[in-house]
Amino acid sequence: MTQPQASKSPTQVEVAIIGAGPAGLMAAEVLSNAGVAVHVFDAMPSVGRKFLLAGIGGLNLTHSEPLDIFSTRYFEQKAHFSSVLPAWGATQCIAWAKQLGIDTFVGTSGRVFPKDMKAAPLLRAWQQRLRSQRVQFHMRQRWTGWDKDGALHFESANSGASVVGIAAAKQAEQAVVARCTVLALGGGSWKKLGSDGAWVPWLRARGIQVADLLPSNCGFDVGVARLISASSTLETTPEPGLKASLKPALGEHTGWSQHFIDRFAGQPFKQVSITHTASNFSRQGEFVATSTGLEGSLIYAVSAALRSDILQNGSATITLDLLPHMSAERVLQEVNHPRGSRSLSSHLDSRLKLHGAKLGILYELLGKEAMHHSATLAAAIKSLPVTLTATRPIDEAISSAGGVRLDAVDAHYQLTEIPGVFCAGEMLDWEAPTGGYLLTAVMATGRLAGQGALAYLRA
């Protein structure tokens, strides 16, 4: 990308960190703690915008599970993180928060949270520490790549804004020459908070291998919204719990019906299990119905495998067990229990506690006729296939997969093609589910990049 020339001589700095999220702030902490003059640039008006968003509903800092299990959460990069996490894992993250005056607790799921559940107090304390170490923040400065002379090129996101430390700038452009640069630009999700993936073509133009950014920890659109029995008839009576008794019916409408959307979009599915046979995934948890499909923590846990399945095959099928605590035989027994004058819905609520979204999805996928065929209904309750056809757009995702390939950087994330330039955080090619794994890895990579930058400056 050819950049215009800035209207003044380039500003000289020792270290430029681009991105004021957790990865950039951690790199700044390492460097400033060693006495290095650090300048942090970000396009947003204030630091940690996505970090604060992550704290809505409770900031999940890390996870308490053993490191050998923890590292497996990083899918294809589990071997890489098995060597990274011993230096910065849950223990170090909890101790670091304590140093900032933030006490933590371990929830019933093993996730670690601040005691007050909030992100803002931790971020304020962190920023105060960095300012005390003379880190300078330059907000509303959008990096647009390198100019023809190799300087970092910035455009003011608000050309009339005052920019701390560089200029009370009324000019829209700024060139910065840094001895060392740490890029912590995020991935491709939540563009309005700064992670727009605009950096991808600029790095590729410099010969850096960057895997395409893809949605991770995302929702999915449903495809076929009606099922038929495997025998194409409701006359047969399959064995209780026969998982092959239902399959998607081609040619029916796709997506939820308007009735389902109006009644159940935003409603939770609690205490259900999902099986994705293609990836040998089976787990119990929660998710919610959306106007286009499904999302939530249990969906996020299998989202990488579902995305891969869809990319390879055009769709992915998950199987829901709506009553994982109950055997197929017991379910069939309760379905067959005489209901007298009660409606089927009242009967299922009374005997099986099936109501709300769980009952709604059965009517949606089976239809009224099949709902009154007890064997088919019982089989569906225990093994309900749902076809997913697409991920939701990357900008809706919690995080993204893809990024700078790990074989394009050294052990401290220095770009092999551009010495003195380091990468950190979500812009690297890795992904993980929610549960504290994302933030832990973002901070761990920022710490390593900061250490690498320090070694580079001292070499």
Region spans (language model):
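N-terminal Rossmann-like FAD-binding beta1-loop-alpha1 element of flavoenzymes
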Residues: 13-40, 450-454
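Glycine-rich FAD pyrophosphate-binding loop
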Residues: 32-56
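Residue-level recognition of phosphate/Mg2+-coordinating polar/acidic sites
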Residues: 33-34, 46, 67-69, 86, ...
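A conserved beta-strand/loop capping segment in the N-terminal third of enzymes
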Residues: 52-122
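Short beta-strand to alpha-helix junction loop
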Residues: 81-89, 108-128, 190-195, 221-225, ...
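Predominantly flavin-linked oxidoreductase catalytic cores and closely associated redox partners
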Residues: 121, 129-350
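A conserved FAD-binding loop/helix module that cradles the flavin
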Residues: 189-202, 206, 429-458
